[in-house]
Structures are given as structure tokens and as C-alpha cells.
């Protein structure tokens, strides 16, 4: 792919104008696509419906903004490969995206000064020139790693999750926890994490419905939460840690598990609601003054929001003087880590987080 040699040359001024005028830009692309006579475009919009289409444009815009802000090419590349894979699996001809990119370019030109628009539109020239590469890479199924020792159990859990009820899945998990010395964190690492990836991939490839994907992830969330609560108890006398997802995240099981893991290492953990606004999150941190804040992003489109929150928290030591740890799948979509300025530590897994916690105490 050309991403290794592609360099962002977009000024902060151009990026700020792009952010400020994003609503108008998105709205124009939405209208242009809906009135387009291109048969591929008409088929695409008709198949997914206006609501999903508009949400996809907003996600696209947030992802572009996050990629530029963090100067991370892989965020951009990986998202579009994923997008092509999703819609190809739904029998949509992804050549329709070429026309969409042209509409984005036109809309950016209409809403920004020419010099700023030309900088932003470098991105769309890149997308157009890499269109065929995205198609090729989207056709390759990504292997999900499962420890060979647990392959059979993984298959059994997956089948039970998709074909049985809550009680059967719960019993299966219970019966096999002893293989992990009843360590729910190890069980989650070896089986639940790849299981969640597999469910997501099956939805992506149109092998299961949205409803089935939602049921499966909700069931995993409920059962793992119950098992964790059975084994850990909060001590309010311990140093305070605040945990939270950032942005419009749909799943928060990961950050809940991280919170209980931190709690098991002698901290009092408060997990803030996934529906909390950025302002409410920051104000809560200022009021509670925790020793540590742990922030997670699953969706790459929320990386920019994470960067902005971390930057604000670190801007005044009188308001917050604690440490900030960041993590989540959205930061590790490739072998490269998405860099977030001013964060004290970026954790890939519980082992890395454990090392950080030992030094913190």
C-alpha cells in the first residue's frame, strides 16, 4: 500500500476549519449522493438506507479528522479496508465510493477557503488512488489468533454463544474456568477477547445479523460482569482510579474488565458512564482528583476526542496532577500504536498495565 510513503501536510488551521464546518460538508455529501444518477451510488444508498448512510458519513468525517490530528496513516488505511470488506460482504459494489470521494472533494471546496480545501483534499486524492488496493486487501480474511491449547474450547464457546441460550453459555464458561485457575482475567485474555473479535468479524462479513451480533456481545458482557463481581470487592480507602470510554462507544466490557483488574491491585476504581459527555468527564476528573485516569477507545473515529481530552487534562496541574493511561483496540488497529500526546502510558494489555501500576504504587 502507498500509506508508508504518504505524508500528511495539513496545517492546524486547515484542520480546524474542516472540523468547524463538518456539518455542512457532510450534509452536502449526503444530498449529492442521494440525488446522484450513478446506478452504483443509487444501489448503495437504497440498500443501506438514509439513516445508516448519514451515520456512515459522520463516522467517515470523524475518522478523517482523527487521522489528520494524530498524523496516523494506518488509521485511515485500516478503516477503509474494513469499510470495503463490510459493504462487499453485503453485495454492494464498492466502486460507488469513488463517486463519494469526488463529492467529498467538491463539498470541502465549497465550504473551505481554496488553500485549506486543497490541503484536506490530499486525503481524498489518496483514497481515490488507493481504491483498488483497498479492494484487494478487503478480500483477505484476517485470522484471529487463539492459543492452540484452547482451540476446541473456543469453537465450543462460539457455537454455544450463537446457537444456545444464556444459561448454557454461562454453564460452559463456569465449567472451564478451573482450567485457568479461576482467573477470570486470563480466561478473558485467552478466550473472551478473541471471541468478541470473531463475532465482530462474522458481522463484518455478513455471516450473522446485527441482531445476532448484538445479542452475543450483550450476553458476553453480562456474564463476564457477573463473574468479575463475584470475585472482587471495592475498598474506598484505596487510592482512587477513574476509568471511562471516550466518545460514542457502543461496548464498554473492556474498560470494565480493566477497572476490576486495577481494583485487584489495591485501588478503588470508579467507572464512569459510557454515555458521559467530554465536558462531564473532564469535570468529574477535576472534582474527584483521582491518582490515575484510564481512558479507552474502541472506535478509531474517537481517537481525536481522546487526544483533545488528554491535552485538556494535562493543561493545568492545579486542576489535575494525576497520571493518564490510554488503551483500547482503536489505538492498536495495526502493529503501530496511535500516538496520543501528553498521555503518561499507552497499554496494549493487562500485563503492561500491571507493570505500570506497580511503579505507580
Indicate where each model-derived feature is located.
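Short helix-loop-beta junction
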Residues: 256-270
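Alpha-helical scaffolding segments of alpha/beta enzyme cores, especially the outer helices
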Residues: 215, 222, 257, 283, ...
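Peripheral docking tails and interdomain loops at the edges
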Residues: 327-361
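Cytosolic, long alpha-helical scaffolding segments
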Residues: 90, 252-256
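Cofactor-cradling patches in redox/metallo enzymes
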Residues: 263, 271, 276-336
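Residue-level detector of anion-binding/catalytic polar loops
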Residues: 268, 291, 344
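Long amphipathic N-terminal alpha/beta scaffold segment
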Residues: 175-252
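Core of compact, soluble alpha-helical bundle domains
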Residues: 1-82, 88-102, 109-178
Amino acid at each position: 500500500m502507498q500509506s508508508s510513503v504518504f505524508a500528511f501536510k495539513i496545517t492546524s488551521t486547515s484542520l480546524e476549519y474542516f472540523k468547524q464546518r463538518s456539518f455542512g460538508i457532510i450534509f452536502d455529501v449526503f444530498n449529492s449522493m442521494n440525488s446522484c444518477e450513478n446506478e452504483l451510488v443509487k444501489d448503495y444508498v437504497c440498500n443501506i438506507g438514509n439513516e445508516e448512510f448519514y451515520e456512515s458519513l459522520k463516522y467517515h468525517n470523524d475518522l478523517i479528522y482523527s487521522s489528520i490530528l494524530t498524523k496516523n496513516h494506518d488509521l485511515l488505511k485500516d478503516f477503509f479496508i474494513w469499510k470495503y470488506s463490510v459493504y462487499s460482504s453485503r453485495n454492494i459494489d464498492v466502486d460507488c465510493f469513488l463517486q463519494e470521494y469526488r463529492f467529498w472533494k467538491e463539498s470541502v471546496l465549497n465550504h473551505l477557503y481554496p488553500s485549506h480545501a486543497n490541503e484536506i483534499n490530499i486525503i481524498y486524492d489518496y483514497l481515490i488512488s488507493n481504491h483498488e488496493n483497498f479492494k484487494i486487501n478487503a478480500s483477505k480474511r484476517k485470522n484471529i489468533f487463539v492459543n492452540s491449547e484452547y482451540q476446541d474450547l473456543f469453537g465450543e464457546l462460539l457455537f454455544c454463544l450463537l446457537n444456545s441460550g444464556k444459561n448454557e453459555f454461562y454453564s460452559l464458561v463456569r465449567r472451564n474456568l478451573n482450567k485457568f485457575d479461576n482467573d477470570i482475567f486470563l480466561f478473558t485474555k485467552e478466550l473472551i477477547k478473541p471471541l468478541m473479535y470473531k463475532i465482530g468479524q462474522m458481522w463484518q462479513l455478513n455471516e450473522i445479523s446485527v441482531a445476532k451480533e448484538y445479542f452475543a456481545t450483550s450476553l458476553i458482557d453480562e456474564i463476564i460482569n457477573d463473574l468479575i463481581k463475584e470475585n472482587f470487592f471495592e475498598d474506598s480507602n484505596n487510592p482512587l482510579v477513574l476509568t471511562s470510554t471516550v466518545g460514542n462507544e457502543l461496548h464498554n466490557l473492556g474498560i470494565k474488565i480493566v477497572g476490576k483488574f486495577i481494583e485487584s491491585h489495591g485501588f478503588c476504581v470508579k467507572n464512569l458512564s459510557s454515555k458521559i459527555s467530554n465536558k462531564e468527564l473532564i469535570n468529574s476528573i477535576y472534582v474527584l482528583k483521582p491518582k490515575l485516569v484510564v481512558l479507552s477507545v474502541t472506535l478509531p473515529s474517537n481517537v481525536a476526542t481522546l487526544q483533545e481530552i488528554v491535552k485538556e487534562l494535562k493543561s493545568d496541574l492545579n486542576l489535575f496532577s494525576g497520571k493518564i493511561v490510554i488503551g483500547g483496540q482503536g489505538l492498536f488497529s495495526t502493529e503501530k500504536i496511535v500516538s496520543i500526546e501528553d498521555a503518561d502510558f499507552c497499554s496494549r494489555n493487562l500485563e503492561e498495565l500491571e507493570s505500570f501500576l506497580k511503579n505507580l504504587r
